Amino acid sequence: MNYTDKLIELLDMENPAIKAMGEVTGDKLVSYFRDRKNPVYLFSISDAEKLKDDEILADAEKVMNHDIFGHKFNGPIDWKFNPTVETSRDNEWSWSLFRTIYWQPLARAYALTKDERYTREFLAEMHSFREAWPADEFLKDFTFVPKQPFPGTAWRTIETGIRVYTTWLPVFEIFRHSDVWTPEDLSSFILGLRDHALFLMGHYSNHDRSSNWLSMETSALLQIAIMFPELKESKEWFDTAYGRVMHEVRFCFSDNGIHMEKTPIYHMVASIAFAQALVMCRKNGIYVPDYAWEVIRRSALYICSLIKPDLSTPMIGDADRDDLTTRRADTSIYEGMNLSFFPEDLNELRAYMKWMYELFGDKEFLYFATLRKEGEAPKTNDYKFSEEGVYVMRSGWDEKADYLCTHSTQLELGERSTHSHNDSMHAEVTLKGEDILVDSGRYIYRSSVWKDWRAYFCSALAHNTLYVDNHELGEIKGVDRRRNVRCLCHFFGEKDGLKIIDLSHNGYAYLPDPVFPRRKLIMVPGSVVVLVDYVDGPGKENHDFRLSYNFNTTDVKLSDMHIDYVSKNGVPFELDFVSDVPFTSRLLIGSEDPKGGWISYGYPVREPAGQVSMAYGGKAPFIAATIVKSKGDGASVRIEGKGVVIESDKGRWIITREGAERI
């Protein structure tokens, strides 16, 4: 096939730059795209030349050797092979392969060295991909997600969008300066991008899938339209994509700037995708409404509000542990957060904060981008996001601060629950900068055959909250993949020296004998946290009640109702549990049957960790209280009648349903 002739037929001969060529030839096109100054991309090759990273050439060499996501191909990349076929049988591996994120190290290495080996490898893989996955049959099939046997198809809208804005466009901005491009190379690449635009024009998820999909679809289509005005169809692409972007950038985020899926990773995916589209518009003189900029600013401020004392983000829903301090933000082998291209930094969370500072000037963005060295800490310690079901309290912003986060993921009615968990009133507790109670992570998706593991990591058992009768929170018979729980905040703030979050939810209302939990999460002066659980209901039947406590190390010891725990940094803590009904306790560490005692910091890796379950078989109502403190701290908690008494060297308080009072 002569790609050059086909491309020339598709060019807009009235485009001033094309018109100025006179007779259009392949060689002229190569020179033109190598040297063109407009339209303007998000960054230039000179920005990529500033990267300081000792390992990027080794990363690129692995790609040169076709060592990708832990699998080394024996020869050329086989685009239809999936190495998980005999284990997890996980489509996500192939979908990650199809996203071509590993072209980034090739482009980065070229920017630093100008070694044309990297260009040639990129071009070879680009041609190979297009030959393995020609778009024609998918362009004709208007089924939203074309049915394909394992390991799936390269032409889902999510992969199509991701390829465009995370690899194809950014690596082209770097590689276009190379001298090895032939007219056929360039034409094949641009025709490949045209295939992406045509597919996205004809296939739009429009909230039929997880809403992060459409952020990637719309941004990618708009970016192609802006960056390739030389193509006849680009005006139609622009008109469609511009409307979608400017509508969805507001529709997908709450007034607080929080993405509708309510999980940090996918929130950042959407924020970055939309921000790229907006910045590209501004760089090329295209109007952007005021609300769009403010949404992006607030979306970044939300991430700031979640950041823990160790400069990581909590694993709310399908989120890995993203760390500002490391070379890369996450540790996923594949299906990770790496869904952008920041030219000067491989850590997307850190680069995102720097970018937000450049765009908006808020000093907290600089504070996190520089790991507290510059800028200013946020002026607020505590955040109440009732609409979204996220609540955060802390003692300060330093590395030794106390931190308390609780969430009850609340999705809009009809929004698929794909990336949220059964986490209502989960407690994330950090004292003196040390993680104690944590979310267990996401581990793996239901696209794999390990659906039992997916179910476990999504369940209330894998969160620090109440689990009743093997009934998942908010489950309604006959209703699939909808998050039906709604949480009510009774109080958020300070009372008599205590910081209190007081919540209840409807997650067990559909049980034959309904159960109604209420939890007070209390920060006590002196690095102490107390959890008070009120569990109510008609009390007609016995239930299996379980309160879970998930830690992030295996250094957990259980003695009846007392737990000793040593943090990753070797700091000892202890927890005491009391109730007005008889509970039993159990410790699991890396148990497969029953499942329990696991943590996953990145997809698809899990490691053993301590999990304690406090169990009671009986009727509601009852009260339970848990105190979390440093080892040897004299603080205590006990139940007196219908109240809970907290004592420490900072004072004595009685906690009741109605509130809290110093005594």
Language model segments and positions:
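Extreme N-terminal leader/anchor segments
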Residues: 1-63
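Aromatic-lined, polymer-binding surfaces characteristic
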Residues: 72-83, 87-297, 306-307, 312
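Residues that flank catalytic or metal-binding motifs in active/ligand-binding sites
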Residues: 98, 217, 299, 387-389, ...
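Catalytic micro-motifs at enzyme active sites that drive phosphoryl/nucleotidyl and oxygen chemistry
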Residues: 149-155, 414-417, 453
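CBM-like, beta-strand-rich accessory domains located in the C-terminal region of large
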Residues: 161, 319, 326-329, 343-350, ...
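Carbohydrate-active enzyme catalytic cores, enriched for enzymes
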Residues: 258-437, 490-496, 501, 617-618, ...
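Short, surface-exposed beta-strand-loop junctions and turns on beta-sheet-rich folds
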Residues: 399, 412-413, 443-445, 509-510, ...
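Cytochrome P450 core scaffold surrounding the K-helix E-X-X-R motif
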Residues: 437-440, 444-448
